C-alpha cells in the first residue's frame, strides 16, 4: 500500500483516532484493506446514527450493495440464516439472507426504506418477525475476534463502532468510480478530501487494537 498517500491523514494511530471522532459525531469513514486482498475502500457509517442523506451517498457513490455489519449475537437474535450453507467465496464474506423492514417501507429500495430496514434490525428489542426476507439490505456477520481474527471490512466496521463507544453495528458499501470500476487508494483519497472524510486502513486498526489490548492488560 502506498503509505505516502495516507500520511496526510496522520500516522496509523492518528488515523484511527480521527476515524473514531468522525463516527462519534455521526459521520462516515473510509476503510481500505491491503492491495493483495480486495484492494478496496469502503464507505462506512454507524447504523446507530444513519440518516437518509448518508444512505443516499452510499447508493450514489458506491456499488449500491449496502451491507449491514452485525455481531454474531445480533445475527442469532434476529434469526438470520446464512445466505449459503457452504461459503465458497474467496474471502469467506459472511452474508446472511437479505432483509427488509416488515413495516414502514414501500418497495424497500429507496434510501428512506433502507434506513428504516437498518434501524429496525439494530433496534435493541428487534425480533425476527420485525424483518421480511429477502430484501434490499445485505447483513454481514462479523467474526467475534474482529480484525485480529479476520482482516475484513466487516470486522473493521464492528471494531470501529465498538472502539467509538457506539452500538456495534455499521453500514458499508464499496466506493466506486464514475465508470463503475472499483475505487483504489488514489481515488479513495481524492474522494475523502473532496468530502472531508477520514481514511483508515485495516492494518492501522489491527495495530491500534493490539496496542490497546496491551494497555488494558
From Swiss-Prot:
The lineage of its organism: Bacteria, Bacillati, Bacillota, Clostridia, Eubacteriales. D-ribulose 5-phosphate binds at residues 37-38, 42, 150-154, 174. The gene is ribB. Homodimer. Belongs to the DHBP synthase family. SUPFAM superfamilies: YrdC/RibB. This is 3,4-dihydroxy-2-butanone 4-phosphate synthase. InterPro entries: DHBP_synth_RibB-like_a/b_dom, DHBP_synthase_RibB. It catalyses: D-ribulose 5-phosphate = (2S)-2-hydroxy-3-oxobutyl phosphate + formate + H(+). One of its GO terms (biological process) is riboflavin biosynthetic process. Catalyzes the conversion of D-ribulose 5-phosphate to formate and 3,4-dihydroxy-2-butanone 4-phosphate. It comes from Desulforamulus reducens (strain ATCC BAA-1160 / DSM 100696 / MI-1) (Desulfotomaculum reducens).
